[in-house]
Amino acid sequence: MFSDKDLRKLIVPLVIEQILAVLVGTADTVMVSYAGESAISGVSLVDMFAYMVITILTALATGGAVIVSQYLGNKEQENANRAAGQLMVGTLLASGVVCVICAALNSQILHLLYGSAEESVLQAAETYMFITAFSFPFLGIYNSSAALFRSMKKTNMTMYVSLLMNVINIAGNAIGIFVLKAGVAGVAVPTLLSRAVAGIVMTALAFNAKHEVYLKAKNVFCRNFEMLRRILKIAIPNAIENGLFALGRVLVTSIVAMFGTAQIAANGVAGSVDLIAIIVVSAMNLAVVTVVGQCVGANRYDEAEHYLKKMMKVSWIATAVLTVLVWLCLPMILSCFAVSEETYHYAYILVMLHNIFATVLHPTSFNLPN
């Protein structure tokens, strides 16, 4: 069902998209470090909580992508369009609720999770969380629209929009931190703007009737509880599974917050560098949904198993190679961050430990469940 050329055409843009995201994310953290360790600590605390929120929204997008891929595999285009419309409805409702809760209760949430952190860190975190909370609806519709394009194997579209989002983000951060000297707000506002632009552009593209699957107003604004139930049947278990994993990371970060600002900053720095080793496996997480979903929709279960094993093998090899490269370049990478010697030391240890376990466990923990 998928030739090697088809797989490369699907996966390579996803890998490039992940490379862009990791490079920009690391560059963001480097720039934030110049605003002080309180700033980078505050941002890292919120990013860890936001990771949990984004994981849940991504699970919803994945649920929709699975259903759409199955319909495409079974040549049911109209049902695929209906599923796409209901995916957007569910995404808007879920992300809207999350946005309101995070914006209204940001101080209470942060004090509950990270109350032992220094006051300067919490103030930075509150500012960052309040502003970026308004980006969740845009990020939600971006993820869902991008999932539709991946279902159609048009990953080049998501790559280009991701590039646009990342360029806006990194340029805005540079202006906010180095020109306007706006500190944490100088990082938060570009994040909001870049996600808003990406969400609007991606959704507008998804309404184009030239695509194999596209959004129709009648499918978005109607109530199709049966279709929504099918999406949620996949999305909810996925959200619980990945959400619990993300919650574990949040709880670990809340423990780290008790140790001091240097440790929080080191955790934030390590978190951005950690992503380098899992670039390929993260791209495979997205590709697996499309490949396996279409095979299952066409009742080709043997092929689904074959492709899954093939993609997991690539994930293991790529993660091992990237892990070695990160280890070799780690002193040079960490020297880019404007942090204390203590923070540098802790970050070094965290990256080393993460990459050891990621090489062994990441493909089975994420590729296989997808």
Please place each PLM-identified region on the residue numbering.
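Helix-terminus/linker motif at the lipid-water interface of multi-pass membrane proteins
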Residues: 23-41, 110-119, 175-182, 243-276, ...
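Membrane-water interface regions at transmembrane-helix termini and the short interhelical loops
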Residues: 145-153, 173-182
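Alpha-helical transmembrane segments and their lipid-water interface positions
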Residues: 21, 25-28, 32, 54-61, ...
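Transmembrane helical elements of multi-pass membrane transporters/channels
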Residues: 9-28, 131, 194-198, 202, ...
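Small-residue-enriched core segments of transmembrane alpha-helices in multipass membrane transport
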Residues: 162-169, 272-273
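N-terminal transmembrane alpha-helices
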Residues: 2-30, 34-35, 51-63, 67, ...
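Small-residue-rich hydrophobic transmembrane alpha-helices
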Residues: 40-100, 139-158, 253, 264-330, ...
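Short alpha-helical transmembrane segments in multi-pass integral membrane proteins
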Residues: 1-14, 68-135, 177-236, 292-357
